[in-house]
Amino acid sequence: NSSIIESAITSGTNVILKAQRNIYVQSDIIATGSSGGDLTLNAGVDINISANITTANGNLTLEANNESISGRGNNRYSDIDISSTVNLGTGDLNITLGNSNTTGSYDVNLSSATINANDITITDSATDNSQPSDLGNFTASSAINITSNNKYLNVNGASLTANGAGTAVNITSKYLSGSGSVSTPNGIWRATNTDTSSNGGNFGGFTGNFIQYGYSSGDAIQGTGSGLLSAYDPGNLFKNYQV
C-alpha cells in the first residue's frame, strides 16, 4: 500500500521492500516534508517503477537480479525499469543490476525516466550485450557515476546534468550508442569505452576537450578537462595534403 510507505518515509522511517522475484511500483509514493526516510527495493528478479516517487530527501536504493535471495528461481527475466519521475531532493539514487545465468531481457531501462537526486550511481553487471541499458533525463546536484563493464550503453535522447565539482559525470561502458548530451557546469565529465574493437570509438554524440585512444585503466590521462577515453587503438592516423 503506497500510502503506508508514504507515511513511513515522511516520518523519517527507513522502508525496505524485499521480494523473491518481482517488485512493481504502480501507485505514486509521495513523501512530504524535508527529512524523509530511505526507501530500498530489493528484488530477486525485476523492479518495474511506472509511478512517481518523492522521498523528501531520503535515499532510494534499487537492487534487482539479486542471487542472494532464496526462491528467486532460475532463468528469470531480470530488469530495472523506470518510466516515471523520481525526485529525491538531497537524497542519493543507487541502482544495481546483478549478474547471473539469467537469459532474456537483462538491462536497466531509464529512457523514459526523469530523475533528480544528489548523487546518481548506476551499476549494470549483466553480461547480455544484446540488452544494453538505456539512460534518460538525469539531474544530479553532485555527481553521476555509471558503470556497465560488460555491455554498451544507449544514450539516445539522454540528458545528463551534474552540478558538482571535479569529475561530476563518470561513465564506463563498452561504448556509447545513440546521441545524448552531458553537462557539468561546475566540473568536468569523462566517458571511458572498454571495447578494443572499432566500436570503442563510438561516444554517443558526446564531444569533449580531447579523445585518448588505446587507453587502459590506470594509464596516465593525456588531456585536460572533459574527455573521451577509448581502449580502441586505431593505429597511426595520417592525412595527405596536396599542394
What are these regions (language model features)?
Residues 21-22, 46, 67:
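Acidic Asp/Glu-based divalent-cation binding sites
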Residues 1-36, 42, 236-243:
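N-terminal segments that cap or nucleate solenoid repeat domains
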Residues 2-10, 24-33, 48-55, 71-89, ...:
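Short, T/G/N/S-enriched strand-turn elements that build extracellular solenoid repeat scaffolds
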Residues 1, 15, 71, 91-98, ...:
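Extracellular/surface-exposed low-complexity segments
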Residues 12-15, 36-43, 57-64, 69-80, ...:
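Glycine-centered small-residue motifs that form tight turns
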